[in-house]
Design a protein with these regions (language model features):
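Alpha/beta catalytic barrel-like cores
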Residues: 1-112, 121-124, 129-134, 141-143, ...
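Short acidic, Gly/Ser-rich segments with clustered Asp/Glu that frequently serve as metal-coordination loops
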Residues: 195-196, 216-222
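Conserved, mostly hydrophobic/aromatic
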Residues: 116, 214, 287
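Short linear capping/connector segments at secondary-structure termini
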Residues: 118-120, 160
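Betabetaalpha-Me/HNH-type nuclease active-site subdomain
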Residues: 189-190, 205
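Loop-centered beta-sheet repeat module
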Residues: 157, 162-171
Length: 309
């Protein structure tokens, strides 16, 4: 079993008034599209940013090892503006060397690595430019995993939502067009807005893509399969690869709030569906812990639910 950490690692800092705040120790640098288009970034500045962010991956790994965290979701913005400046990353020997070293260390410590491209990655869109941009984003994540030496299997998942609803034929068409290093790692996650588990299973049956079961999204879905059926059948889509799932909760006190407030991730995990908890304890799945307090929530979840490292 692995509980997965999402992109950040928080450490406590005591303020002058004695209160405690949590700060992310992963210091990723960003670049702004507007500034780039206005010519404010030199090639040297972009390269410096890319090299720095890759070094941050290497600096993150000891924190994961310290807490015995065996699954980690990489940020999607290690190479900001990659769609415009990807050649700078791909052509730099230092970046390639550091990515290869990071991949080697992740594998040495048995840490699963995944990514989750953002909400604008929509391979079922009715706009061709959106699909083209989405494919470029997926190719970026695949390049990253290739450079780290990761196998081309969904164990190293590039996980997305289905995107625009009622467009399953377009989703399948785009999937079949994807390059092999993307397609072999791609997974689809259920949500309450566009594609529920039942719909994703129908897609998976046709193209073989694994389904990431998100129990929180499932709770807000409509016209879906019973929980036990959805849970069991999503596991079956993974074949011989260990399934990846997600867990998150509604924040305490928000149970009767507006819809979007109920959907938002809580700071900590206070409830796990019994079937999912059984699978976690039985080492049948890896589960990304989608909570605002990141590793703090992950470690507390281990303790509260008696989950072995």
């Amino acid at each position: 079993m692995a509980l997965g950490l999402m992109c950040q690692f928080l450490e406590p800092r005591v303020k002058r008034d004695g209160s405690v705040v949590y700060e992310n120790v992963i210091d990723e640098k960003l670049l702004q599209l507007g500034a780039y288009k206005n010519g404010k970034y030199s090639t040297e500045r972009i390269l410096e940013t890319y090299r720095y962010n890759v070094k941050e991956i290497l600096r993150t790994i000891p924190y994961l090892v310290r807490e015995n965290i065996k699954s980690f979701r990489l940020s999607s913005t290690i190479f900001p503006l990659y769609e415009f400046c990807g050649d700078i990353a791909r052509g730099d020997g230092i970046i390639q060397q550091d990515l290869a070293e990071a991949g080697r260390i992740f594998r040495e410590h048995g840490i699963r690595v995944t990514t989750h491209p953002g909400q604008f990655c929509v391979i079922s869109s009715d706009k061709e430019n959106v699909i083209e941009n989405s494919i470029r984003e997926l190719e970026y994540h695949a390049y990253l995993f290739d450079a780290m030496g990761f196998d081309r299997t969904p164990f190293y998942a590039i996980n997305i939502h289905g995107g625009k609803g009622n467009r399953s034929e377009k989703l399948i068409e785009t999937y079949n067009y994807l390059p092999e290093n993307v397609k072999s790692r791609l997974t689809l996650e259920n949500d309450e807005k566009c594609y529920n588990v039942k719909q994703l299973l129908a897609i998976s049956e046709r193209i073989g893509v694994p389904v990431v079961f998100d129990s929180h999204h499932y709770n807000f879905g409509v016209d879906d399969l019973p929980f036990d059926v959805a849970f069991r059948e999503t596991l079956a889509t993974w074949g011989s690869v260990k399934p990846l799932q997600h867990i998150s909760n509604t924040e305490i006190g928000m149970e009767n709030a507006a819809y979007n407030q109920k959907r938002a991730h809580s700071e900590m995990i206070r409830y796990i569906p019994p079937l999912q908890l059984e699978a976690i304890r039985g080492n049948l799945v890896d589960v990304d812990v989608e909570a605002k307090l990141k590793n703090i929530a992950l470690l507390k979840m281990r303790e509260d639910f008696q989950i072995a490292n």
